């Protein structure tokens, strides 16, 4: 190899390395910065955009509560019963304290007012929200439901509480009885736990399953395996023909005070969420 050929080869190699370095620099600078929203599992993440320097994967994959429907049912005078059905799509996450608010609007879509309350929701639960006898100075045409930020709690191997309703019935009251109509039934606690409070929501539907009226009551201090009668009374005449009665029983398993102290032995595993 002549001296001139060697010189040409060296110049060619230098030119190649300069172009390669420039190309690598352009490629590096054109790459998006690593983030927790780039859709790529990088920067020591445990999953895509979660774990490591990003939020925990279980929090990233938690879904919002779904609002299935809402309705304002006219009650006595200027009062309404506000009703919604919601669903928690998360199989192992729930919350013992969920802050929510109903906003109600008139026929011209003007906000009339709002009503706030607290509830709880269990993993994978579909439930009703009821606010009874809420005052409104104008007729309610539209009802909206929203939630504040929820502090989720995880339950491993969750099984829903076995609370059953039997012998439910609805009847009109006689003139000798106080009120217009009444729903009743038997609540059975088939869990292994003694609960301090169990909520019962009652919905009356017509033959088209349109909501006519709602009511609510509660059962206190129901032991494991025990059953208890419940009654709810409507004092105002209900417009429409009642064809179906839906009754939902639920209890807050996230509240330690809701579990009555066992007489013997250690607390059940169900409380260890």
Protein language model annotation of sequence segments:
Residues 1-8:
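N-terminal Lys/Arg-rich, disordered targeting/topogenic segments
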Residues 8-60:
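Cysteine-rich modules of extracellular adhesion/ECM and protease-associated proteins
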Residues 29-30, 55-64, 154-163:
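Proline/serine/threonine-rich low-complexity linkers at boundaries of modular beta-sandwich domains
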Residues 60-116, 130, 194-196, 203:
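The feature marks the first
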Residues 65-72, 86, 113-117, 130, ...:
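Short structured motifs
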Residues 78-93, 150-214:
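Surface-exposed interaction/gating patches
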Residues 134-174, 231-273:
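Terminal connector regions
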